């Protein structure tokens, strides 16, 4: 059973404001509305008159690593070699139908697999589905076969921005995933569980198809919203259809919170984590979580659409960008900021203060800035014409974003 819960700083918009937001409607489990430098930064990526099919441009992509990426050592908060994507619903994949195949982030992972030989799916949000208004879903489904769970949405203090919590011993959160989803090998040999730890947290028993594989002790003296389990390998002969049950331990004066899962082929290889969440704003994210997500070899930040649409305080917006900038500089992370605030023909100055802030942050961090309006102008099918309020790219739009990003990276030295 699922109870609904929100933090106070999540704002609900009227329908007129919804047109400005990169957000999707919530999963069916929760019916309330959600809102969602060497810098060649001004250089327009090369454009083509025709839209290439995904297999076309991916096939044409060189297998040579991107020259500006350095994976000689792991730099993320867990010691992994990683690329962390931090965005909203556009980057989570809304309107791409199958997030894990057709979103720009999924296509970018295909490019990374070609160049680096790694097929790790990485972090996947527990916000698994949207409604029919803006279609799409994650690779797994979430259910609650036992006990009561509360959803903390856009909570901001965990990687990925949302979590489920229970105060009942024996409560179970179930994650169902098929290792051959859609008839394609998903390269899932194991996984990590994300959870907050602290003095008021309990244990989490991890079962796969009824077999206990691990017990996570989240009870620690100090709070850490970004804890992650040890790698949990699947047993031999594990069936393709998997039920991962996360079962709460003793909750006397304690709770269990689960904030995500990461599907892994090889834990020693590069991981692309997509920490994007429908409805989130940059100003929603707690400083500690933001700084920790910026600990990676490469950080791709695509936030700003919801901040602009909801009129987020520009001072706070710039303060959060400063956190991103300083965290990347301190950690030696390469920062790429992608602008996904779409231009408006009837309002050329729309959201210019936010766009300028994004560009300036990339410049000041010695990173890269890429305006994805350059992808939008390649096709009149980039957005859904039948939904003029919808800022989420179509499958064609997602493909163009990934294509423009990879072309851009190929041309950097």
Model segments located where?
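Bacterial N-terminal signal peptides that target proteins for export
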Residues: 1-11
């Amino acid at each position: 059973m699922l109870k609904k819960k929100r933090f106070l700083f999540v704002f609900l918009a009227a329908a007129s404001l919804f047109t400005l937001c990169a957000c999707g409607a919530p999963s069916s489990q929760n019916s309330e509305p959600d809102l969602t430098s060497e810098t060649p930064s001004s250089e327009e990526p090369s454009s083509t008159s025709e839209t290439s099919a995904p297999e076309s441009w991916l096939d044409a992509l060189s297998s040579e690593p991107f020259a500006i990426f350095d994976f000689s050592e792991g730099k993320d908060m867990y010691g992994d070699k990683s690329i962390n994507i931090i965005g909203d619903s556009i980057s989570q994949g809304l309107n791409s139908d199958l997030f894990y195949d057709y979103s720009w982030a999924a296509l970018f992972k295909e490019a990374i697999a070609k160049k680096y030989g790694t097929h790790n799916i990485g972090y996947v949000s527990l916000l698994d589905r949207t409604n029919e208004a803006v279609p799409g879903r994650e690779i797994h489904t979430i259910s609650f076969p036992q006990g009561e769970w509360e959803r903390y949405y856009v909570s901001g203090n965990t990687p990925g921005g949302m979590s489920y919590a229970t105060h009942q011993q024996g409560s179970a959160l179930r994650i169902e995933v098929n290792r051959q989803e859609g008839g394609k090998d998903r390269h899932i040999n194991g996984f990590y569980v994300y959870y907050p730890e602290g003095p008021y947290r309990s244990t989490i028993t991890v079962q796969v198809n009824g077999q206990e594989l691990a017990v996570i002790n989240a009870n620690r003296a100090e709070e850490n919203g970004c804890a992650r389990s040890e790698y949990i390998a699947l047993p031999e002969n594990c069936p393709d259809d998997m039920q991962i049950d996360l079962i709460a331990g003793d909750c006397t004066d304690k709770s269990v919170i689960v904030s995500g899962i990461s599907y892994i082929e090889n834990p020693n290889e590069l991981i692309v984590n997509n920490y994007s969440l429908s409805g989130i704003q940059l100003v929603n994210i707690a400083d500690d979580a933001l700084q920790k997500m910026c600990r990676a070899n490469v950080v791709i930040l695509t936030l700003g659409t919801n901040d602009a649409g909801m009129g987020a305080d520009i001072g706070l917006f710039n303060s959060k960008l400063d956190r991103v900038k300083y965290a990347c500089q301190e950690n030696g992370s390469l920062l790429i900021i992608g602008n996904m605030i779409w231009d408006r023909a009837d309002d050329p100055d729309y959201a210019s203060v936010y766009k300028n802030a994004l560009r300036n942050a990339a410049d000041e961090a010695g990173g890269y800035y890429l305006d994805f309006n350059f992808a939008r102008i390649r096709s009149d099918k980039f957005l859904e014409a039948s939904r003029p309020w919808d800022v989420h790219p179509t499958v064609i739009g997602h493909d163009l974003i990934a294509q423009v990003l990879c072309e851009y990276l190929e041309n950097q030295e």
